[in-house]
Structure formats: structure tokens, C-alpha cells
């Protein structure tokens, strides 16, 4: 029986009660003291898999904590849930669908049945279709209306059709293929469209319209604007097929737009947008880094899939990260989680993980529709490297909130400059160390006295220089940001999110909150342009509509 058919109140489980008791016992736990008392703590709380090294020793845990968290995973039948996910059972209850993004990275020889049909041949058929297109563009065989080769590819999409592909293509910029530049157009903002098209020539530009329904408002409006721009630059309707392709499950709408059916790449309803970069949605990735590197990306994710399915929970990277998140969110009161990549090319990973985590686990009812009895997904935020140290790290160190953090850092830079990377790596480690160690009152006073401060100044300033420490963090180290390791890294967080959804009993694969805003947006638009005379549902919205209409002259 699929795991979601037996919803649970996690707070009523014996393992949850045991964790509550343990949390009270851990109230005065000190990481600083734990490291001093146990020379093997680092060894005990680190593991390596799929090209990733995880140090989770700087957490408010001991061996008993880990055992109790694993006990919770066992009580919610996490093993059964993982099996359900990979075997294509219905894990998205509200939409009655499986969630099979993992199928997109499985070998061609595998067999996976959905409604009695093996989907793997279709998965690899699309992969071959992508391979063919990428080869034609890279070889200069796909030409625009003036017979010049394509030099620029613009991906028009939003949400999962944008964030994942943008992350990967920019993270793997060192693997970029010469001759083709990739761009992204997501927001329904004329300024973004204007800034992008200023860099392009219509005769050598190919647009990818990525929308499962071919009806996503922002994507469709941008596609229509791109089409109008193409025609205004000298392109013709007859040659439109050379400049527009689609990734969609709505072939009829794409054909009506002017895209040839053979240039429409399919999507399946068992792949959610935020999990779709492994599908034809990843076409701009393949165009950016080449097909062999795209397949390495898939292989890296597949290796993490294997690890997730086979490793004992005590040594299972996604499971441990997920359970630590539950530990802080449900037992220590943490409301957010910081993602801190110390690599310029990984600067967009926080945006992708925001959608992955918050759209998946931002839920308040369980799979069966009953209210949850505990907090669920945290706010995900953060930013790149040393920049954050001079911005929001102050709050991490001395603020009143407990905010767990993930540091992500490579050992090797693709672009070494003097000793910059050694300093970058040192900063990453020292930040996690400072969060853990802090600075005591005695240390603050000694530091001030060593600098020659008077006793009056010491007593006046010492409290300001005290840093509580004992702030938890994980550190993920990769040798370098390669396609395979990046694939494993993204899959790691996908599985982390799923594990947490299983613990809380919620559906990680729907997003009904997003749909409400879309529905209301149509009515607001109609009132803005005057095609709807009835008042808005509330005075605030109507007042803002009136304010716009009284001043807009567009």
C-alpha cells in the first residue's frame, strides 16, 4: 500500500515523544565542549558519497540524537516511502500522480511501469531527440531565416522551467561550448525583455518556449513578445519554425503558435516543474554545456538516487540532512535555513532550492487533507560566499533566532587568481567555526585587555563582543563543480525535501497555493484594463486598482 494512504500524526509517535524528551536533555549541550571531549567527533559525524563530502559534526547532536532521528524515520516508514517514490506509486495524492523525476536519469535498460506502460523507452527517445537538436545547433546545421547559424538561445520559462536550468548552465559555465550563448527570460516585465533583446540578433536567435500547458501567463506573454520582436526585426511567419521550438505537453497550442510538431519536446504529468531540469526542460543546459556533459549531470543525479535507496539511514546523506532539518524546525524552533555557497558559479543555487523546498513543503495539511500538527517547511534563503559575511552573517552570529546553515564549497577553482581560492575556502571554514565556537565573556574581556582597553572600557564593551556560538551548520565539500557532482548535489536536496515531507505526512509534489494567485490575477487584470466593472473582493485590492487607473497612462 502506498505510504500516503496511511497518514500519520507524527507528533503522536513514540519516536517523536522520545525526541521531545531528548531535546530537554540537550538544552545545555555545547558543541565546543563536545569537540573538546571527543577527538573522534569529526570522524563520527562525516560521510562521503557521489563525489560529495558532508561534515555535519557542527550540529546540536550526539550519537543518541542521530539514533532517535533515525528511529523517527523508521516509525514513519521512510523505507517504504522511498520504495513508493522510485517504483512509480501514487505519491502525489491530490493530483493522483506518481513523481518520477528520478526516471529521467535512469539507464536505458531499466524498466519502470506507469499505468502498466514502461516509460523508459520514451524517456530515452526524448534524450535522443535532445541529442540530435544539440548536435545540429553546435555543428552550425540549424540555421535562421538568413541561413546564418544559431548563436544565441533564449529559454522562455518561469519557475521550474527557469530556476533549475539557469542554476546548472551558470554553475557549469567552465564547461560551456563555444559558439552558442544561452539566455533566460522569465519575468513578465518589459524591462527584462528589453535588456535581453538589446543583446540579440533575430536572424541568429532560437527561442525555447518551456511550458507544460503552453498557457503559463508569463511564459506565453514573453513568447508572444519574442515573436513580435522577431517579425519586427525582419523575420517572416513562414520562417518562424527556424526560431521557435517548444517543451510542452500541449502540442496543439504550440503548433497554433507556429512551432512545428517535430520541434516540440514532450513533458509528462509525472514530472513536476521544480524537478524537471533532468527532462527536455534541461534543453538549454545541454545546449550550454554539450550533450556528453548533460549526460554526466544525469549520471551524478542517478548515483545519488542509488545512494538514497541503498545506504543505511545512519549513513544516508539526504536522510541525515532532512532529519537535522526536522530536529531544528520542530524541536529547536528554527523558522529558516540558510544556503551559503562559497563559489561564484553556484550563486543561483539558493534560488533553485527556495523553489524546491518552499514550494514542495510549504503545506499545512497532510496527504489526506487533515491539518498538520507541527511546523513544516522552513524559509530558505542565503547567498554567495564572502558577500554574505558583510551583509547578513551578523544576524547568524549574534541575532536572537536559531538559523541552521549549509555551507557549500569546492576545493578547486576553475579560475585561480593568486591565493584567492585559499582565502575563499578559509573564509567558508572560519564562518562555520565561528558559528560553532562563538566568543565567551571571558574571551571578550581578555581580548579587550590585550588591546590596552581600560577596565571601564572592558566592562562597557565586552557584552557587545560576546558571540553565543553553538549555532549549527553543515559543510558540503566537492573537489570541483563538475557536471556529475552538481547532478548529485541537486538530487541530494531533492531527496532531502522528500524525506521531510514523509516525516510530516504532507505532499511535496503539488502547489495549490500558486494556483490561487493565478486565478485571482485574471480578475485583477480585467479590472485594471476596464473590461470588468464589478468591484474587487476586498477594499484594499480595489483601492490599489483605482490608484493605478488614476495614474497609469500606458
Swiss-Prot record:
One of its GO terms (biological process) is gluconeogenesis. It comes from Pseudomonas fluorescens. It catalyses: alpha-D-glucose 6-phosphate = beta-D-fructose 6-phosphate. CDD domains: SIS_PGI_1, SIS_PGI_2. GO terms for cellular component: cytosol. It is found in: Cytoplasm. It is an enzyme of class 5 (isomerase). This is Glucose-6-phosphate isomerase. GO terms for molecular function: carbohydrate derivative binding; glucose-6-phosphate isomerase activity; monosaccharide binding. Disulfide bonds: none annotated. Belongs to the GPI family. Catalyzes the reversible isomerization of glucose-6-phosphate to fructose-6-phosphate. Its EC number is 5.3.1.9. The active site is at 359 (proton donor), 390, 518. HAMAP family: G6P_isomerase (MF_00473). Pathway: Carbohydrate biosynthesis; gluconeogenesis; Carbohydrate degradation; glycolysis; D-glyceraldehyde 3-phosphate and glycerone phosphate from D-glucose: step 2/4. Keywords: Cytoplasm, Gluconeogenesis, Glycolysis, Isomerase.
